[in-house]
Amino acid sequence: MTFSICVREEYETERGDRHRRFGVAVTTRLPGVGTLCPFVSDSGAVATQILVNVDLGARGIEYIDDGLAVDDALQALLNADDSAPQRQLHGVDGETTFAFSGRECVDEYGHREGDHFTVAGNMLTGDAVLEATAEAYAANAVHDATDRATGPRAVTADVETDPLAKRLIDALAAGDLEGGDKREELSVQSAAVVVETTESHAVEPPYNDLRLDATETPIAALRETYDLAERGYRDTLERYEGAFTAGSLDEVSE
């Protein structure tokens, strides 16, 4: 039905400020996955899938925001859920990870946990989907490192790393190349990527919250949408250069 990845990255800006960012990327052979699966804040990231209960994701993030560890938060929700054997639930907080696949999930299903990320999927063509997704992300992770590719600098400076949203889409693409969701009879698909960070900018990147709710080519469509959003961000920064630091768009000539 679905495969997804949840990520935490800790990084330092060139000025020496420490920050965390969290992200989820997901795709499935059903429409509208972006309304159901990914839940992200500047404290954590959670994905809920297979027999979806959006309350698990929403309340999980609320608990994490309130200071609960992700494993305590999500396990408590599952303990109170009679349908837990049919759920997949995974996520990250500022310190730890958690991943759960109920025994009644549909084959092939499973999950992986890295030091600061989780991957889970069900109704897959095989375990290689999960492995490829995890390996593609891990190979390009920017964690415990200085990152110049944040905010406006990601599109206006010569930087070596890609924004997290793009790297999450690339991880989905790697899993999809291994077969992805096995239900080929379902042609209408969807995908989404959401990123939140403790770092703030006068103009926030629009590509950190993207959804394709109904398409036959979810990964390609999400990547194209990302590219357009990145270009639009760059164009906006160039067109209104100085306006946001000046404090008023009225000070920018048309």
Write out the residue ranges for each language-model feature.
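N-terminal nucleophile
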Residues: 1-254
